[in-house]
Swiss-Prot record:
Record's keyword terms, sorted: Oxidoreductase
Binding site for substrate: 566
Family assignment from sequence similarity: Belongs to the short-chain dehydrogenases/reductases (SDR) family.
MF term (GO), any: oxidoreductase activity
Entry keyword Endoplasmic reticulum: no
Protein name as it appears in the record: Uncharacterized oxidoreductase YuxG
CDD domains, per database record: R1PA_ADH_SDR_c
């Protein structure tokens, strides 16, 4: 049940004007059962002074593409009402003309483009107006007997408006319906949503919430009298079993849905999702259509339902069904586009955004983790709507042609243009070992800065969490995650890749960077020291690369590995035989994997740094003293010593190595594998030959 959370004390402290609207909007948007992500809109009418100092009536309305839950004052657009109100006398107004007209009504050209539904707010005579998409209300609006149900709940207090796409015509229909019903307190838009109003921001909010609560109570009473979704077809698998299966199957799904463009995945196994996917009605009900027009751009018209029996069929069968299911969905989506397209339309990715798997839950796809979560959140709202609608009558949706025209509607697509452009590592996932160290953290930041999703793997979990937290703060929740990994432990490495699969669907880039270093004259090198170097830098690189290779093969979309070697990979360092030997091993292992990985599109290259002291745990250890002693200098003279021995007379920093790593991982090096790059300022003894 939605809750009334208006705080009168806080509201009283707000400046009069737009901040009141911001507060109300944030409250409404904070409950996704009331308002979809990015959907709905709010408004208020005020008196302002124009640039001449004259008082004019202004309507503040949500700007297109913003989200009620998080929007601020600058996300609203102010429009001159005296310029808008005369439009109601017109008989029609095409979308393009409406958008152009409203641009001339804005009090400030720097304001965002006003909402598609601006006229709906302007044509109603009330000071405050809310348009929302509550689950309970849409359940009524998407029931075949919805109008009758509305009469049972609201009597003569509502206006029912048949489905019309948002714009001038719908706005005029709503205004006329309200004007013709003196008892009207709300508008129900068929297959769409709710409109409410009030003379103060608080009374408008109260009306929105109370109207929804009435619907919820009515629907809950009916749900309790029915077998939800026709009853259970399957039992959900135990949680640990679900995760075990998903860890192996997510890369298969990711590969299947990434035929055209790479996708980031997320999964959802909330109780409401499991109730739906395991139900008798799910196979048919899920294919009827979208529960709300606002869902279409993010969920497509229907999900992919995998008809897998979790009680009798194995994971291999599930993988086969996913591959064939995605292939069928893709061809059907392309046919859907062809049947309905208009001049200028460009097809989206054909792969499903929502995949329903009995016993397991829901997998969602998107260009980023955030957008895959949006698809999932919206489909959970669709499940709630279908649950309510089927308790009232039959669930109905838009016809195919109208669904298409909403999905490809220029006014809806405009919102997508407001997102930042994709960068080099957008849609990709990079796992970096030693990610909390100097080079590792620089690589993590470099990938994130160009759109990548980053898994910061390190034995130092606190350091890894710090780096991941910084990335999420800078680029958004879900862009990075930290995993504890001891690269010498097979179970740690396998667990990290399983977590990568569960979090994002798999990996595209792996940077083998975890390291240490020791220094001893050869005849004083102990077996313990030798094994330590071999375990971390040899076995560790092998284990990480092997698990990466497996996951990349399962995805069947190629991939890139970058080994961080050393100048010592090609140069025999004095008093460092164990370290230098295993660094040579690393680069040859990289070449061996490159030779095997080519047929799968898996590239493997190496970056050979030298003397990267900044932020390095290695150089903060006894290694600094040991190397200084080897050169007969003081530890604090080491950095200058290294600079002077380079041909370019430069110091090398973590960001320099990160740049080379990024190059090998990028499309710029898509035809390069088995290669090495030295980033050492030019140490003649380490010139590759």
């Amino acid at each position: 049940m939605v809750k009334h959370i208006w705080d009168s004390e806080r509201a009283a402290q707000l400046p009069k004007g737009v901040e009141e609207l911001v507060y109300r909007s944030n409250l409404i948007g904070s409950d996704r059962t009331v308002c979809n992500w990015g959907g709905g809109n709010t408004s208020m009418k005020t008196t302002e002074k124009d640039f001449r100092g004259r008082e004019i009536e202004v309507m503040w309305v949500k700007g297109s593409g913003s989200d009620l839950a998080t929007m601020k004052a600058h996300n609203f657009s102010g429009l001159k009402l005296d310029d808008i109100r005369p439009l109601i006398k017109r008989d029609q107004m095409p979308d393009e003309e409406m958008v152009d007209y409203l641009s001339h009504c804005m009090i400030d050209s720097k304001h965002p483009r006003p909402s598609i539904e601006t006229l709906l707010h302007a044509f109603l005579p009330y000071k405050h107006v809310d348009h929302t998409h509550p689950d309970a209300i849409i359940s009524i609006c998407c029931a075949d007997n919805g109008k009758q149900i509305a009469e049972d709940i609201y009597g003569n207090r509502f206006v029912w408006v048949p489905y019309v796409r948002p714009g001038f015509t719908l706005s005029k229909m709503i205004a006329e319906g309200v004007a013709n019903n003196p008892h009207a307190e709300l508008v129900l838009m068929e297959k769409h949503g709710l409109v409410t109003w009030g003379e103060t921001s608080e009374t408008c909010y109260q009306k929105t919430i109370s109207i929804i609560q009435e619907a919820e109570q009515y629907i809950n009473d009916r749900i309790n009298q029915h077998e939800v979704f026709g009853g259970k077809r399957y039992q959900p698998l135990p949680e640990d079993k679900r995760k075990q299966i998903l860890a192996g199957i997510m890369p298969v799904i990711r590969g299947a849905v990434s035929e055209e463009k790479k996708m980031i995945l997320s999964y959802d196994d909330h109780d409401d999702v499991l109730e739906f996917v395991n139900s008798v009605q799910a196979p048919a009900l899920s294919q009827i259509g979208a529960a709300c027009p606002d869902h279409l751009v993010h969920t497509k018209r229907v999900p992919l339902y995998i008809d897998w029996n979790p009680e009798t069929q194995d994971v291999h069968k599930l993988a086969d069904l996913i591959k064939s299911g995605v292939e069928t969905f893709t061809s059907e989506y392309q046919a859907y586009f062809t049947r309905n397209q208009q001049d200028g339309d460009q097809i989206f990715e054909s792969a499903p955004r929502v995949i329903l798997i009995p016993g397991i839950g829901m997998v969602n796809t998107g260009k980023s983790y955030a957008m895959s979560k949006v698809s999932g959140a919206l489909y959970r709202r669709a499940i709630a709507v279908m649950k309510g609608a089927t308790a009232l009558g039959q669930f109905v949706s838009l016809h195919e042609n109208e669904s298409y025209h909403v999905e490809y509607w220029p006014l809806e697509l405009y919102k997508l243009t407001l997102a930042p452009p994709e960068a080099e590592f957008s849609r990709k996932v990079a796992l970096i070992t030693g990610g909390a160290g100097g080079i590792g953290s620089a690589a993590c930041r470099r990938f994130a800065a160009e759109g990548g999703h980053v898994i910061v793997a390190d034995l130092n979990i606190e350091g890894a969490q710090k780096i991941a937290g910084e990335i999420n703060d800078a680029y958004g929740k879900g862009r990075a995650m930290a995993v504890k990994m001891d690269v010498t432990k097979e179970e740690d490495v396998q667990s990290a890749f399983e977590r990568a699969a569960l979090a994002y669907g798999g990996i595209d880039i792996v940077v083998n960077n975890a390291g240490l270093a020791t220094s001893s004259p050869f005849d004083e090198t102990s077996l313990k020291e030798w094994n330590l170097n071999m375990n971390v830098l040899g076995t560790g690189y092998f284990l990480v690369a092997r698990e990466a290779f497996k996951q990349m093969k399962h995805q069947n979309r190629g991939g890139s590995m970058v080994f961080v070697g050393s100048k010592n990979s090609v140069y025999a360092g004095k008093n460092a035989s164990a370290y230098s030997s295993v660094k040579a091993l690393e680069t040859h292992l990289a070449r061996c994997i490159a030779a095997e990985g080519g047929e799968f599109g898996i590239r493997v290259n190496s970056v050979l740094p030298d003397a990267v002291l900044q932020g390095s745990a290695i150089w903060g250890s006894s290694w600094r003293e040991e190397r200084a002693a080897a050169y007969g200098i003081e530890p604090d003279q080491l950095e200058e010593h290294y600079r002077k021995r380079t041909a370019l007379l430069v110091n090398i920093y973590p960001e320099d190595i990160a740049e080379a790593i990024a190059f090998f991982a990028s499309s710029k090096a898509e035809k390069t594998t088995g290669c090495m790059i030295t980033v050492d300022g030019g140490v003649p003894a380490a010139f590759t030959r």
